[in-house]
Each structure stands twice: as structure tokens, then as C-alpha cells.
Amino acid sequence: KDTDRDVEKRMPVKLTKHYFEIAKNSKPIQHIVKATPDETNDLDGAEDPGNQMDYSPVEGLLHKYEMGLMYVVSTCSAHCRFCYREELIGRKEIKRQDGTVAKKGMAKIPEITAYIRSHNEIVASNGGVHPETGREKLREILLSGGDPMVLANSKIAAWLGALAEVGIESIRIGTKEMAFFPQRFDETFLSMLDQFHETYPEVGLRFMVHFNHPDEFLAKDEDGNYIEDSSGILKWNPDSDKAMKGLVSRGWISVENQSPIIKDINDDADALRIMQRALKRVGAENHYFFCGRDIVAHRAFNVPIETAWGVLNESQKGLSGVEAHAKLSITHYLGKTEVSAVTNEPIPGLAGSE
């Protein structure tokens, strides 16, 4: 305790009652939230491995591509031990582009909307491209954190309305709350979304959910086996089923799942195959699987890129074309890159592959 080996110092332990009940009968889920000494055996890694703060023109906003990402909250209802934002959740100080050291700040509506308005006006007056950055119109925003779904409905509504008013065409909400606390997607929240859509029907709304393993949403019997209905289809646990149906039943909302491939959690082709098939069956898309990032203590969680690619490739055998949409992505300083193949042979024309 109170040393570099303190796992609580690296990332506080936190979970919901709903998730605790699932974890009691699932080793993979236990690995998601249970702290172990392995996390601090090797503290190699970076607090900001993608140098994201180099792309932060306004506090709380990352503007690296045509899409912007906003930190709207610094907490979640439970904590994944492998969290890519552990520096934000733990409120740690990181080095910024100007050499200063400070905690990441949260986005604020006046500053964010002023930046978007100014950027898009400059782009519009210069033939559709910003003269300094080369970026096009900022048309899509991802609400992130932390988990935006821990915010009150009124705060989420305020962000949605402010972004719509400033001309954002598509809004994503990144959340793991459907796994941690699916009861959050109640009728009051869904009614708020309905009102938003009635007011701004032209604005797209996408929920980027974070299921890592099918145990997070599928129902199990007392022996730990998945439960099938009379047609042989795997049944969801009631709370997750209700939450997912609440979103996908609204045709104007898209739901897409993305997940890293993490050691002892989902580096299992059978588990990923079940998850991809079950999600697509209920109307959610399989978006990305990610290779682990070099966060602090990453060696306790990451698998080699070759392993991640092999697991995903094997998992998609037997899936239909629409079930197997997910790609493997690796994130580095310049951006996301798809891992399309792995080879031990030299690649013609690629220097250094010999």
C-alpha cells in the first residue's frame, strides 16, 4: 500500500451489484474487475500512449480526425482493470504538448461549441478544408470519458442538444453501462432520447457499447452453461435484454459493440464467436476488436498482435458475412490501422520486413 506496487493506486477497484452477481460465476468477468498483484509487477507503459493530448485544441476535446472525442466525465460505474483511460479514471497528471503536467480536464459546453462553430466556419470559407490542419468539417462527436451514461439524463440531454444546435450531424455515446448497470437504460432515459429525436430528427445517434465477453449479457444455468430457448437460441439475462431492446427497437438508433482482446478475458475464439453471433442476432453490429495499448502495466493484460489476430480470425469461422463485420484494429500515434493479416514471410516492397 502507498507504493508503486499498490494496485488501488494504479486503478481503484469498483463494481456494481449487477456486475458482481455475474462475476461470481464467471472467471473471465472476474479478470475484468478483480485487482491482482500482476498489475504492478511490471509498470512499464505510458499514461498517454497515443499522445492524445497533442490533439486537444480545447480542454476535454480530442480533434485528431474528422470526428471529435470529448471527455465529459472522469468516472464509470465499475472499473475494468485493463482500462485504456486509467490516467483519467485515476485522475493522474500527464505531460502535455506544451511541456506542462496536469490532469486531463473535462469538456464544457460553451468552450466546445465555440470551437466547433469556429472550426467549421473556417473550413466552409476555405473550400471545405482547414488551411492549417487540413481537416474537413467536424461533423461527428463521440461522448466519452469515463462513461457518459453515469451522468444524469439532464446533462446528457444538454450535451446532445448543444452539439445538434452547433451543426454536429452524428453523435456517438461510448458506454459499458449496458454490461455494468443495464438498468440505467430505463424508460425515463429512453423517453429523453425520443424527445431529442423529435427535435433533431436529422442527427444520427449511435451507442458504442463495450461488451468484452458473452458472460456479460447471456443467461446461465446453475451449472454455468448458457441457456437456450425452445429454438436453440441463446437467451440474454433479463436486464441486458431489456436495455438492448430499448435501443435497437428505435430504428433511428444504431448500436455497435467494440472490445479489446485481453489476456484471460476474451483471448478465446469460441467466446468471441458466441458474442459476435448473439449481438448481431438482436440487432447490434460488431464494430472493432482492438489490440491492447501500451498503458501502464500493459504486460498484465495484452496479448501479442499475432495472437489477437489469430483469435479473431478463428472466431469468425462459421459466422455469416453480416455477423463477421468486426475488424482488428491497432492504435498508434498516427491513428487506427486495421490488422488484415499476419505472416512470417517477407512482404514484397516493404522495407524492413526481410
Locations of regions flagged by a protein language model:
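Conserved beta-strand segments that form the floor/walls of ligand-binding pockets within enzyme
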Residues: 71, 142, 172
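A short mid-domain helix/strand-loop element embedded in enzyme catalytic domains
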Residues: 50, 59, 76-86, 115-122, ...
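Flexible, acidic/Gly-rich N-terminal and inter-domain linker regions that tether
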Residues: 1-64
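Conserved AdoMet/S-adenosylmethionine-binding subsite of the radical SAM
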Residues: 109-138, 146-307, 311-318
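Iron-sulfur (Fe-S) cluster-binding segments and ferredoxin-like electron-carrier domains
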Residues: 83-98
